[in-house]
């Protein structure tokens, strides 16, 4: 039986060094190296990096193998969309408008990006009490009147019981809801995209200061997305640059030297292992965060991590919770790990347990670990394993560049970053 893994403290001696200078990311790093050598000596290291990244177009960023050619039609059911995102292990995918004309431009061809945060919004909306309370309303959604009454009468205990998600995922509502029906949860309207000639600096600032997790790159002459650059992709690029002068000059700094972690233990949103798993997703939605640590009640030590992408395991494998009277965060973690072990998928981030570091680790060590483990956050602990802080991919990218005064100008004109009903 799977158990909750112990905290894994990052050890610098186990990280190794990059040696594949032929990778596209390493070649890109060497391009930065050449530009670094050309910068004026009076510039600070941060100013040099800004100048280097401003000189490189985003078209030079290696194509993403994870998200290439993964598009979802607007008439795809939500159930199929969840299966697609889960199958290809991606957090999001662009949605193609099936009603768009064949000669449509890219901005008319796509209606947005569907992502797990939006799916969480939809899921939690289904758990709100239906109104009016009638058999007809329940039947129209594909639920039995008895099941709806149970949810109303028993509240959270009903929606966290082991069979709730089996009923939900077999309902007509889940099967018939289309991706276009949840377009109000899309992060951008339709979404913010970069043109191929935009700079790396623009891209890095959007992924850090402006909190975008992924950015489509488009060619105005082509009605198709050319590439999708993610925070994880940038971290992988940086990991491939280990050994290069500019990277070593920046990466040798310790976390405490660069002001990390930004978020201290008193401000971390957390959940205890005996609380309902849906409470974790509610907290992530309410606080607009991508993940949350699961804490042991007695010791206050982190024993796991639940991220927004993990909602897929409630919807793609609801049968694994059938025997539980209540799906707590601990039950959820144990069940998902057992399920993935049986499926032979031991590389999923949820299998890693708690990956942690200390304030004495360097940026380079942190980047190599995040890239190796394919995770989006790392917890900072003290010598006794107690939680001290949290560092995300965005925090690291934000330490790489800074925004010059007036840099974006009218770049955001006409863009709607967050729809009114977007709550993640």
From Swiss-Prot:
CBS domain boundaries: 63-131, 185-244, 263-324, 350-408
**What is the name of this protein?**
SNF1-related protein kinase regulatory subunit gamma-1
Family statement drawn from the similarity comment of this UniProt entry: Belongs to the 5'-AMP-activated protein kinase gamma subunit family.
UniProt keyword list: Acetylation, ATP-binding, Carbohydrate metabolism, CBS domain, Fatty acid biosynthesis, Fatty acid metabolism, Lipid biosynthesis, Lipid metabolism, Mitochondrion, Nitrate assimilation, Nucleotide-binding, Phosphoprotein, Repeat, Ubl conjugation
Assembly information from the UniProt record: Subunit of a probable heterotrimeric complex consisting of an alpha catalytic (KIN10 or KIN11) subunit, and a beta (KINB) and a gamma (KING or SNF4) non-catalytic regulatory subunits. Interacts with HXK1 in mitochondrion.
**InterPro entries noted in UniProt:** AMPK_gamma/SDS23_families, CBS_dom, CBS_dom_sf
Residues with Phosphoserine modification = 44
What post-translational modification information does the record give? Sumoylated by SIZ1.
Q: Which SMART domains match?
A: CBS
Give an example GO biological process: nitrate assimilation
Annotated Gene Ontology MF terms?
Answer: ATP binding; protein kinase regulator activity
Q: Name one Pfam family in it.
A: CBS
This protein's GO cellular component annotations are:
mitochondrion
Record's subcellular location: Mitochondrion
